[in-house]
Regions:
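N-terminal glycine-rich beta->alpha transition that marks the start or flank
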Residues: 41
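Short, surface-exposed ligand- or partner-binding patches at beta-edge/loop junctions that are enriched
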Residues: 105-106
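Conserved G/P- and acidic residue-centered "switch" motifs that form tight phosphate/ATP-binding loops
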Residues: 110
């Protein structure tokens, strides 16, 4: 565990490797060894582009968004909004992150990050941390707050860590040809 107690990790964000880090700890790990510590953003390309991103994070989407008005919804999403697992996910990560290096996985709030860590663990990666509050952080749960329901608690963006909208082509997702 890089910086906080495992008991504080939401059940949906837990992984088979049991390696967790909060955004501040993840940033410190990357600063200490940027050649061997990789930040992997597994959000969709659209989230990465339009929601902002950590400008040194490699984007490899775990899922691709799909809409089918007759289909099921992903948890917490409107009816018909679902996702299809990226069939090239593990191979794409293998192309950008050596399996002997440390990988810090980020999604929006930690759930997809946990799924990504588990897939990478199954593929033989051993030092993969889930950034448990992700890029956006948890929702404010206070009906009296103007921020009720908004992702304004914790997370990379809310911790005041560096992020932006600039693009670095070598870090962005490219579909295999």
């Amino acid at each position: 565990m890089a910086d906080q107690a495992v008991e504080e990790v939401a059940e949906s964000n837990k992984t088979t490797l049991g390696l967790y880090v909060w955004p501040q700890g993840a940033y410190a790990m990357w600063l200490a060894d940027p050649q061997h510590v990789h930040l992997l953003d597994v959000r969709t390309f659209e989230e990465y582009v339009f929601g902002g991103h950590v400008e040194f994070a490699k984007n490899v989407p775990l899922v691709f968004p799909r809409f089918n008005p007759e289909g099921p919804a992903m948890p917490g999403r409107p009816p018909g909004c679902s996702g299809e697992l990226n069939p090239d996910f593990v191979a794409a990560v293998q192309r950008v992150c050596p399996p002997t290096d440390t990988i810090l996985v980020m999604c929006a709030t930690g759930g997809r990050g946990a799924m990504a860590v588990n897939l990478l663990a199954e593929a033989g990666f051993t030092t993969v941390y889930n950034i448990v509050t992700g890029f956006e952080g948890d929702r404010v749960d206070d009906p009296g707050s103007v921020f009720h329901g908004k992702h304004m608690r914790n997370g990379w963006k809310n911790a005041g860590l560096p992020w932006g909208y600039d693009f670095h082509p070598d870090l962005m997702w490219e579909e295999p040809t």
